[in-house]
């Protein structure tokens, strides 16, 4: 009872966001899709990881999550590259939670130099580098076959400017219980996907399937069947942009009977592991 009272008193003295109860340690992993490449991952140890947070203007994001406070207390923010549909809401989310935005090193250098975020919220790391952004959580940056640029409106001129976004990456996210998630970011096919699968052995792959800017259904099916061979795939990066026309149905048809379980979530739906 005394412990509960201390928690309640602390909440009364803290900002609204931090008065929310901490995510309970359930021993399970919950993966909530928020549209495009944005996910809210609740870890077995009670941490919350948010990837590629483009939410406010994302046509697929459920209305409740367009308010960033609805995500609750966020412990780790991961951004795969500088394109707006992956980076847009990351700075605000970092400031709101006072946690770093982890992104490719050269991208974060640009974000810091432009004053978008203060230096303590833009740590640098790069491909093959492994960090521990929260106790029990390991994140390794791996190759992605894409591009990256930051488009920023200069407050002095009111004009958009293009700035270096570093090299795009994917992330191997290892949780407290050893469960590994491969968030591929935006990528086309590259044969080192086979190496990533052999070396990191991901249990779950978050895979772009929309095409035009990333792998389409046929390419994604080839990567799944021939190189990655994961237990489970959640399709992502489709439907938010009219050019990303690939669908989970097309992907699953191209994949056939591969032994991989495909979970085509709707925005706002979650899978539990």
From Swiss-Prot:
It holds the Pfam family Lactamase_B_3. The keyword Hydrolase applies. It comes from Polaromonas sp. (strain JS666 / ATCC BAA-500). Keywords: Hydrolase. GO terms for molecular function: hydrolase activity. This is UPF0173 metal-dependent hydrolase Bpro_4324. Belongs to the UPF0173 family. PANTHER family: UPF0173 METAL-DEPENDENT HYDROLASE MJ1163, UPF0173 METAL-DEPENDENT HYDROLASE MJ1163-RELATED. SMART domains: Lactamase_B. The keyword Hydrolase applies.
